[in-house]
Swiss-Prot record:
Residues 1-35, 203-239 are annotated as: Disordered. Residues 21-30 have a biased composition (Acidic residues). The lineage of its organism: Eukaryota, Metazoa, Chordata, Craniata, Vertebrata. This is Potassium voltage-gated channel subfamily A member 6. SUPFAM superfamilies: POZ domain, Voltage-gated potassium channels.
Length: 530
């Protein structure tokens, strides 16, 4: 039976070896972690009661890590049991030890959550390169610059920037965030309500009745179709239908200022005033103008307000340049083109709903999850594309002999393949033959399997960002100092290193491993003092 070497405690300032000779802490570190015959010796590592045994030369492959550096791991040594004790996660240490044994291969155990395993990587100080490689293998976004948010150098600009950009920074900032959310919701409600038939009918009916223009039944049908397209996007009465009639006069004078006195237009104007004011204030106070326009949320703010000004400018131009229509088709085509362009521009207003993500942590987590899962989503779309081509072709040839087939061509069958693989099944197109039904069954099964494959990866990314966000909120309540190496100031515990004798003996040796404040914390403290 192998006898284990042990150390006995002596007077403060000295350590006795296995033969009883006196050693100081420095001599003990050299004997324990030095080269020569000692490098083939084995040491015992206790992880929360689970003992591991490995060779010193295995750990010395990575001397810049916690276990590979004798000076760093000595603070965890228990001389009574002749082992290193770590009160850490036990399942994670299997992968940590395998990292040393395999020469740098880091694989997370399936029963260990991602955030816990990353904490273990940081604790054992495997290095930034190992952490970055692990995050890339897990499909997570690379760290760097996300947690350290720059602030303006001027005190006034800093206060304004915190007021409009960080709602959690103060009470007034939360009030401004609440006002912004209410304005966004009002704008979205107005965007939906103005398309109701009763509101669209008021503007259309008023212009037709007031214009005094009589149209033939044939021309009335065509112009009513144009009016429906017009009212589907424009403000009530913004482009009157009387102006499009043959032989009629412009109805702008008849309507007077209906466009500028419409309740929807007035509420929309108030919302745009707030959006513009908020955007200009944030732009003037931002620390970097170039980074301001690279932010996707600021681009959404611009997209949310420019349709209003384009529509307003078009309306003003038409009010000043509208001429009586003499029945020419060129004027009608120009009007139709203007209506189509404005309809698309007005559709952009729906993107205002994404402004809510600035004030919602949940939407931000969802956006980061989708960004981190772009590779899996791309594979999903690629597999769906292959399935659509395959099954649409198969169902077309399976139904080719049926005279009542609903699949006249392969492109027409694309729609059926998409709704079948996504398990929607509208029922507007369906196979009738036995072969077509078999193809449809296989298409549905393939769609379920294809969609289910990337779901675990997406869920894992969502859990990672969710736990990281909650941890940041909890850590933000405390003063946190990070350091590259552990602090030697230990209190008395049950292990040997916690004993006053051994701590006193190795204090001078470990004085070089004192922690230094993290750069981000130092900058934050300077800003607080200012």
């Amino acid at each position: 039976m192998r006898s284990e070497k042990s150390l006995t405690l002596a007077a403060p300032g000295e350590v006795r070896g296995p033969e009883g000779e006196q050693q100081d802490a420095g001599e003990f570190q050299e004997a324990e972690g030095g080269g020569g015959c000692c490098s083939s010796e084995r040491l015992v590592i206790n992880i929360s009661g689970l003992r591991y045994e490995t060779q010193l030369r295995t750990l010395s492959l990575f001397p810049d890590t916690l276990l590979g550096d004798p000076g760093r791991r000595v603070r965890f040594f228990d001389p009574l049991r002749n082992e290193y004790f770590f009160d850490r996660n036990r399942p994670s240490f299997d992968a940590i030890l395998y990292y040393y044994q395999s020469g740098g291969r880091l694989r997370r155990p399936v029963n260990v959550p991602l955030d816990i395993f990353m904490e273990e990587i940081r604790f054992y100080q495997l290095g930034d390169e190992a952490l970055a490689a692990f995050r890339e293998d897990e499909g997570c976004l690379p760290e760097g610059g996300e947690d350290e948010k720059p602030l303006p150098s001027q005190p006034f600009q800093r206060q304004v920037w915190l007021l409009f950009e960080y709602p959690e920074s103060s009470g007034p900032a939360r009030g401004i965030a609440i006002v912004s959310v209410l304005v966004i919701l009002i704008s979205i409600v107005i965007f939906c309500l103005e398309t109701l038939p009763q509101f669209r009918a008021d503007g259309r009916g008023g212009s037709n009745e007031g214009s005094g223009t009589r149209m033939s039944p044939a021309s009335r049908g065509s112009h009513e179709e144009e009016d429906e397209d017009e009212d589907s996007y424009a403000f009530p009465g913004s482009i009157p239908s009387g102006g499009l009639g043959t032989g009629g006069t412009s109805s702008f004078s008849t309507l007077g200022g209906s466009f500028f006195t419409d309740p929807f237009f007035l509420v929309e104007t108030l919302c745009i005033v707030w959006f513009t004011f908020e955007l200009l204030v944030r732009f003037s106070a931002c620390p970097s103008k170039a980074a301001f326009f690279r932010n996707i949320m600021n681009i959404i703010d611009l997209v949310a307000i420019f349709p209003y000004f384009i529509t307003l400018g078009t309306e003003l131009v038409q009010r000043h340049e509208q001429q009586p229509v003499s029945g020419g088709s060129g004027q009608n085509r120009q009007q139709a083109m203007s209506l189509a362009i404005l309809r698309v521009i007005r559709l952009v207003r729906v993107f205002r709903i994404f402004k809510l993500s600035r004030h919602s942590k949940g939407l931000q987590i969802l956006g980061k999850t989708l960004q981190a899962s772009m590779r899996e989503l791309g594979l999903l779309i690629f597999f769906l594309f292959i399935g659509v081509i395959l099954f649409s072709s198969a169902v077309y040839f399976a139904e080719a002999d049926d005279v009542d087939s609903l699949f006249p061509s392969i492109p027409d069958a694309f729609w059926w393949a998409v709704v079948t693989m996504t398990t929607v099944g509208y029922g507007d197109m369906y196979p009738m033959t036995v072969g077509g039904k078999i193809v449809g069954s296989l298409c549905a099964i393939a769609g379920v399997l294809t969609i289910a494959l990337p779901v675990p990866v997406i869920v894992s990314n969502f859990n990672y960002f969710y736990h990281r966000e909650t941890e940041q909120e909890e850590q933000g309540q405390y003063t946190h100092v990070t350091c590259g190496q552990p602090t030697p100031d230990l209190k008395a515990t049950d292990n040997g290193l916690g004993k006053p004798d051994f701590a006193e003996a190795s204090r001078e040796r470990r004085s070089s491993y004192l922690p230094t404040p993290h750069r981000a914390y130092a900058e934050k403290r300077m800003l607080t003092e200012v």
